[in-house]
A protein has these predicted regions:
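Non-heme di-metal
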Residues: 1-115
Length: 115
């Protein structure tokens, strides 16, 4: 059976996205806990982030897997180019169109950083 185009592939993508977002969120929470002098809570969030990262790695294996360094560099360059040349400028335009000027500016700033 072919994974490409299957509901299972979509579930893998959704799960990978969720695990990736949770990992970042927990790292943000850990940083805040450190700022508020709660090292034990920060450590807990960091462990949770590590676990989410491992879940993401397992899921990614089925989606694409990690290639060789040259292939990984090409994929990274292509992804970053797409973000700053198309995705973020379009997001900025839409944000402004909908009246979210501050978010439009955020997308513009991210565009500059991504370049």
């Amino acid at each position: 059976m072919e994974l490409k185009g299957s509901r299972t592939e979509q579930n893998l993508l959704n799960a990978f996205s969720g695990e990736s977002m949770a990992r970042n969120k927990y790292l943000f929470f850990a940083e805040k806990a450190k700022q508020e002098n709660h090292p034990e809570v920060a450590e807990l969030f960091e462990k949770m982030a590590q676990n989410e990262g491992m879940h993401g790695k397992l899921l990614y294996h089925y989606l694409k897997g990690v290639g060789g360094t040259a292939e990984n560099l090409r994929e990274a360059v292509d992804g970053e180019y797409g973000e700053w040349s198309r995705m973020y400028p379009e997001f900025a335009r839409i944000a402004r169109e909908e009246g979210f000027e501050a978010i439009g500016k955020l997308f513009d700033e991210i565009t500059k950083i991504e370049r």
